[in-house]
């Protein structure tokens, strides 16, 4: 009889993941206690804001509909400027609606979580031949388009992500925004950063998703239309 090995058990066979749990699971559980959240059966949602260089971790408890902010991690460093990633080597951190598609327990940057760039929107709007890729949230403090949060903090985030996936969450969503896209912000950013209409329209498109989550603390399913724009699924 073949014994089933859970995702968490498989991950814990890696020394760095085992170390992360030993060092950081108690810290992560304390975040839950401080926010009066249940550690069992939760789901995770990530939001990154490039201008302020912050990565938010939101939690949805089992049986609940709404997400609650658990913790915020600071980027350790950044690259590029505000605006989406459009080609290999542009140093840009992507902007858009993504999910974690890879857990790397033996990363060159300690531990890392892969972001599914290029996604369906990027496949339409980015360079067709060389859109770039290999975008990760990772340890260390160096980047050419990724989000580094230090070895110390990636341990915490990796534990959270492993727990969520082990709880049955197939895709951990991550929304990456240039800034907090409140009313008037896309227009002000477009002026301050002297971007072209393609970039400003991208920001206005993302604003609808940002504002909906801000108002409801729920994630609506999103699809991509033929123009590469995000839209709520009907």
Regions found by a protein language model. Name each.
Residues 1-144, 152-172, 181-234:
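Cell wall/extracellular polymer interaction/catalysis modules
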């Amino acid at each position: 009889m073949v014994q089933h090995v859970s995702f968490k058990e498989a991950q814990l066979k890696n020394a760095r993941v085992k170390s992360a749990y030993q060092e950081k699971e108690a810290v992560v559980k304390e975040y839950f206690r401080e926010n009066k959240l249940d550690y069992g059966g939760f789901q995770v949602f990530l939001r990154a804001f490039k201008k302020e260089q912050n990565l938010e971790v939101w939690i949805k408890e089992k049986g609940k509909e709404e997400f609650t902010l658990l913790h915020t991690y600071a980027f350790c460093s950044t690259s590029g400027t505000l605006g989406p990633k459009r080609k290999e080597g542009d140093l840009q951190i992507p902007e858009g609606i993504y999910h974690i598609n890879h857990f790397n327990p033996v990363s060159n940057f300690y531990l890392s979580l892969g972001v599914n760039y290029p996604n369906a929107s990027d496949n339409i709007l980015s360079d067709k031949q060389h859109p770039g890729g290999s975008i990760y949230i990772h340890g260390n403090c160096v980047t050419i388009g990724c989000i580094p949060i230090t070895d110390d903090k990636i341990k915490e985030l990796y534990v959270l992500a492993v727990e969520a996936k082990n709880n049955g969450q197939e895709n951990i969503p991550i929304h990456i925004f240039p800034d907090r896209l409140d009313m008037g912000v896309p227009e002000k950013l477009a002026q301050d950063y002297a971007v072209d209409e393609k970039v400003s329209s991208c920001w206005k498109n993302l604003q609808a998703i940002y504002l909906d989550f801000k108002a409801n603390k729920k994630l609506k399913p999103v699809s991509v239309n033929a123009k590469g724009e995000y839209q709520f699924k009907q």
